[in-house]
Amino acid sequence: IGLNTIYDTAVDLYAPGPTGPLFGRQFDLAEYAIGVNSLEPQCGWFTTSQIPAEANSWVGTNVSGYKNPAFDSACQQALQSLPDEAEYALHQEAQAIFASDLPSIPLYLRLKVAAARPDFCGFALDPSSSYSLAGIEEFDYGDSCAP
């Protein structure tokens, strides 16, 4: 097995399709950063409609070209449901299909780091939020907060 490594600049790697390597899907294997604002990537990023193509002006997050009608259906129904509806459980089905097919392999998670003074209480990093001040209304400081 051979591997020819190409290190592109961000400008070149993320160039629009059809000629750009990532969005033009001109690669056998690609390592790139994808930003997430939740604990896992959104299922909608890997639906068939998100494959970059001429029809969508080469804009889409599914650069792997992953296609699975069962995944698409579960994801779309889950995204259109509320937490108290039965269809919301289809997020788990979409995740199970994703884990089985593995169209993308997460290499590492972005660490969330913060610091607070010793007499500061109520502060905790929420893994489901992008904001370290998400629970600001619960913050306090003073002698009653000392460890």
Predicted regions and their residues:
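Short helix-initiation/N-cap motifs at beta->coil->alpha
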Residues: 4-19
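Detector for C-terminal structural segments
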Residues: 18-147
